[in-house]
Amino acid sequence: MTNLDAKSIIEYIGNAPKKTPVKVFIKGNLDQLNFPNTIENFTEQHSGIIFGDWKDVEPFLNDNKEKIVQYRIENDVRNSAVPLIDLKKFNARIEPGAIIRDQVAIGKNAVIMMGAIINIGAEIGDDTMIDMGVVLGGRAIVGKHCHIGAGSVLAGVIEPASAKPVQIDDDVVIGANAVVIEGIHVGKGAVIAAGAIVTKDVEPYTMVAGVPAKVIKKVDNKTLDKTGLEDDLRKI
């Protein structure tokens, strides 16, 4: 796991070089160009693609106007301090459209569905599913074999540095569109109903529902029948 505390994350972001990466499609007399080491180029005689930071690419384009006939720039961030993580290193199922920042830990056989947003310092345990559109804020911790329902939010805490992160223990099921505010601890095997707003810690094997969430009952066999997880969905 990342084990990043708030102070470490603040230092990481504060000291990180801020980057504006761009991809540029160019046409012209490209064989006459001298590309600096700061610009990666995949060009042929008259067309190609270059990659680099805008602070390097912009002056290069301006200095070579006579040789470059046409160009189109693609760019999706500005002065970004935290890049997206390299997904290839995880033994997990990560679907298209998930946005996962650097310094995130994802356990074996975890599932990250489309549109999930996972911020720096978050931790996801083995066999846990993060459903569509879920937001895991900075430093949010989710244990093993959990299901975080579509559209749910686990609030992040990076500032103030003294704040406690959300902690979800193993075997927890959270229904769609629930919100767990910062600093909340949800105990092992608990169930949070869809749409609940959790403002207090939840005891293990307890079901809560409502706004704000209140204890409904202890998790029983009937609850488990309705909230059981399917291990086949977690196979890689």
Swiss-Prot record:
Cysteines joined through disulfide linkages: none
GO MF annotation, one: tetrahydrodipicolinate N-acetyltransferase activity
Catalytic activity: (S)-2,3,4,5-tetrahydrodipicolinate + acetyl-CoA + H2O = L-2-acetamido-6-oxoheptanedioate + CoA
Keyword Transferase: yes
UniProt keyword Amino-acid biosynthesis, yes or no: yes
Domain of life: Bacteria
CDD domains reported in the protein's UniProt record: LbH_THP_succinylT
Family: Belongs to the transferase hexapeptide repeat family. DapH subfamily.
Protein name, per record: 2,3,4,5-tetrahydropyridine-2,6-dicarboxylate N-acetyltransferase
Reported function: Catalyzes the transfer of an acetyl group from acetyl-CoA to tetrahydrodipicolinate.
This protein's pathway: Amino-acid biosynthesis; L-lysine biosynthesis via DAP pathway; LL-2,6-diaminopimelate from (S)-tetrahydrodipicolinate (acetylase route): step 1/3
Keywords on record: Acyltransferase, Amino-acid biosynthesis, Diaminopimelate biosynthesis, Lysine biosynthesis, Repeat, Transferase
NCBIfam families in alphabetical order: DapD_Ac
EC identifiers of the protein: 2.3.1.89
